[in-house]
Amino acid sequence: MSMLLNKQLFFRDLFRSRKMLSWLKKICWILFFLLCMIKLYAQSEVIPGLFTTYQQNGRILWVIPDSLLGRDMSLTTTILEGAGRKKKSADAKFGYQGDRFGPRILRWEEEKEQIILKEIRSYVDTSGSYSLGSLLAEREMPLTLQEFEILGCEKTGKIIDVTEWLRDGKLWGLQPFSFLIGIGSEREGRVTAILGTPESVIVRSERIYEAVERTPATSANGEVTRWKLGCCLRLLPRHLMQVRYASSGVGYFTVPYAHMEPGSCQVISDRVVKRWRLEVADRDTARYRRGELVEPRQKIRIYIDRSFPEKWRPYVLRAVNNWNALFERSGFKNAIAGLMAPDSAGFTLDNSALSWIVYKASPMENAYGRPFVDFRTGEILSCHIAVFHSVFDMLCQWYIAQTGESEEEFPDELAGRLLEMVVSHEVGHVLGLTHNFYGSSLCETEQLRDAVFLHRHGYGSSIMDYMRMNYAVQPEDGVDMSDRIPRIGAYDSLAIEWGYRYFPGLASEEIQEKLSVWIEKKQLERKYRFQDSGGNLPEAQAEDLGRYSLETAELGMCHLKRLLRDTLRNNGRLSVESWNLAIRKQYSEYINQAFTYLGGIRKCWGNDSVIVVAVGREEQQDALRFLQTYVLESGKDLPREWWEGWGRETVRRLVEKADCFVGYDREYSVTEYIRDLGKIFRNVSGEECWGRFLIWCYTDCLMEYIQTERNRYPEVVALMEEQLKVMYRKTDKEKDVFWKAWRKNVNSIWK
């Protein structure tokens, strides 16, 4: 009996000792962890922010809060210092301080005692189909970018080591954008600083890349480029912005949008527009419904970088703030503001919450505006507007070529007003607006020369057209130079109201239906019409002007004639080469406008539909006469290098235009067109070098068309062969060496 009792006591003590040992082990682990954390806190640099960052002995640790697991974040990359290059292309658009790329949408998740970073590359709105939502989510699996071991836990999150990961140039460098900026493989990279805010973490680094030529992508003689970058990982709002479906009646940049309707098993593919999240605060909803102006919950603020030259700042600020009047049509006051960036630590180019206008030292004669968008809804998160230094050379060229002025000075006030116009156009882009090439066709030719009309109304419906200075104005019209510069117009106001009018309580589909009816009614007026790509629409071309662009092009030619007589004088700002380039560019624009009439179409807006009709016979014949006058006849008065290029290209395009007449019932038939074209070239004199050049070009183009399109367009080929035979018979008795060679050339096609 006593032996049995002793055994029971022995096993009881053994069990207790093992249990005690287990508790002791747990206590030791806790003490060890606490000691590690004390050491971590004591010897580390602590950077608070969206993620708490610990830096110790070259190691970088992040604490990923449990509350942020499953939340979406945006990652953008900004160039803080661009690389100096031995040779940089004049048309290089990217690679300068302030250039921003992205965003990529990332998400942190916890799986199997690991922290997983995933990239969201596609999105389907499943809110309308609860039963299929999880199934669809499985189909749209995010891409796993990185897996992190959990090193420890804090009260609010998990600790991971990001040291090596932050050195990876694929996510934290310029590798994804290498072709845009002309770099090759990365040679070296190091993290230089980490900054934190409650909403973001900014990782700054220095990286060295091999330089490559953009075309072809080969190493540029072993040259290396050094870059300073800032990558901003920013928390996105928990609730997505309400989408607005795209419409063909108004021009907005769009993103693809997949969604499911209630009770449906089918994924519907749509497009939604890019726009800022302008919403009415709950306290202001009643006032907004009554038609009172209210301030949006979150305003659009665009900061001008302090590197921007001081004398141009007022024009840039005005270019932004002028859009406020348009937002008032949408019910918002003070919706957008252009501001000078304060000289404080938080206002940095790599903070993706901030939008910037940056001045860039570059030979590129341009500017651009880029909105950075959450692709899931089209919400514009921020924007970047670049103004290149050499844009003033382009503005000066416009001034000379479109006004015929050749004074020795290009006044700063005029340059500033033109800069304001350029930046206003780019602000329109970062608000989501695309080009509207119908905007310049609003006015009659007489209105374009009426000083009183121009002062009151301007001369276009949209700043989003490629509409430059009013070249229809002649010196005797007495129009002030400030009234020859485009302004924000009626279409721009309509487009902003369409995109930013707030509809409390309505679903996106209801808003779409409401806006469709509204925009169709508005487009009965010319000033509210939209056309994104001109194609063969004479009224919707880049660089054109007026309802009848052939008339205004002839007026514009008057300026160029004066300049051509005065090519040795220039305004001092431009070189002779740039002076000539300005004239050549403008001359080419007028030629291009005439070509759109040949085989062109017009849109006629009605109450129920838009009807497409062919351009009339007289207008097309006028276009032919324009090309005959200003290229085929005037070419001999131009410098040889000009007319050789224009002459050959014009003749080729005239012949190929025959394609546009095939298969359509037109007032001006393909037969009439080819015969009219033949008459023009039969009347070209073969006595001069210029005439012989044109005749030979015309013949070569006809022969090439006959050989390549015989099976495709036999009717057209027969007409062209007829024209060759007519010209052959006319010159059959000519004994000149040129005509002998010409007949021999033609005979080769009939062998």
Question: Language-model segments: which ranges?
Answer:
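Auxiliary tRNA-acceptor-end handling modules of aminoacyl-tRNA synthetases
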Residues: 43-308, 326, 341-415, 419, ...
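Hydrophobic h-region of N-terminal signal peptides that target proteins for export
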Residues: 32-41
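Zn2+-dependent metallopeptidase catalytic core
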Residues: 69, 309-335
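Polar, glycine-rich mid-to-C-terminal structural blocks
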Residues: 383-414, 422, 472, 478-508
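Conserved catalytic/binding loops enriched for acidic/polar residues
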Residues: 440-751
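Sec-exported extracytoplasmic/periplasmic mature domains
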Residues: 321-332, 428-429, 433, 469, ...
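The catalytic-center signature of Zn2+-dependent metalloproteases
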Residues: 340-360, 417-474
